[in-house]
Design a protein with these regions (language model features):
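Exposed alpha-helical structural elements
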Residues: 27-28, 46, 62, 66, ...
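Short, compositionally biased "basic patch" segments
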Residues: 42-68, 117-120, 124-125
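A general boundary/transition motif marking the beginning of the first structured unit of a protein
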Residues: 16, 55, 68-71, 83, ...
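Metal-dependent phosphoesterase signature
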Residues: 61-91
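Active-site neighborhood of HAD-like aspartate-dependent phosphohydrolases
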Residues: 2-55
């Protein structure tokens, strides 16, 4: 009689305001505006796109597509490396204590997080897909329910056991918290605060 293969135990982490205490995509945007000041010429277009989002003409993913057009005008690989040379030190110390296969799922750009993922020896990175040359978003922004969808594109649901989940956002990461068979950790100012899923997300 064949026994079922043992499931892989994994922990899931958000990235921004979880592993680092800031929104890395926004920080990189500001960094590029300072170090590559010609990108400032794009700000009126980005501001207009922001207004269109506020009035409901653009959705958030469309707004992000406009924001990342600045990638066309910078030395992307050099900028990303120099950014993380400066900001890697802000990674939360407790992240180095991880004990099992770690999956980071983030709405930040894949081309931007791949560098820090290598430096931190992450097991798996799932992030918003971008065209590596143009910076344009490919598909959907990796946030909310999209995180779960992307997880199961990478792993067969029957082959993994989600143990612990870490995120700063109780609102947007409800869906990945629901996967936890171990513990849920709400990250508040860098501190891990354990909570019971059923206490926070009451039915009805």
């Amino acid at each position: 009689m064949n026994s079922k293969p043992e499931k892989k135990d994994i922990d899931i982490y958000d990235f921004d305001h979880t592993i680092v205490p800031f929104d890395s995509g926004t920080m990189f945007f500001v960094y590029c505006m300072i170090h590559y000041p010609w990108c400032i010429l794009l700000l009126p277009f980005i501001g207009f796109a922001f207004i269109l989002m506020l009035v409901g003409i653009f959705h958030f993913t469309q707004f992000k597509r406009v924001c990342y057009t600045y990638i066309l005008f910078i030395p992307k690989e050099k900028a990303v490396k120099k950014f993380w040379d400066k900001f890697e030190k802000y990674v939360e110390p407790w992240f180095g204590e991880r004990k099992r296969y770690s999956v980071v799922i983030s709405a930040s750009p894949d081309f931007f997080l791949e560098e820090i993922a290598k430096r931190l020896n992450l097991d798996k990175l799932i992030a918003t897909r971008h065209n590596p040359k143009t910076g344009i978003i490919i598909g959907e922004n990796c946030r909310g329910e999209e995180k779960v969808k992307r997880l199961f594109e990478e792993f067969d649901e029957s082959e993994i056991n989600v143990v612990d989940v870490y995120s700063d956002s109780l609102k947007y990461d409800k869906y990945i918290f629901a996967l936890a068979n171990g513990k849920c950790f709400h990250i508040v100012k860098g501190e891990r605060q354990e909570f019971n899923y059923s206490d926070i997300y009451k039915e009805g």
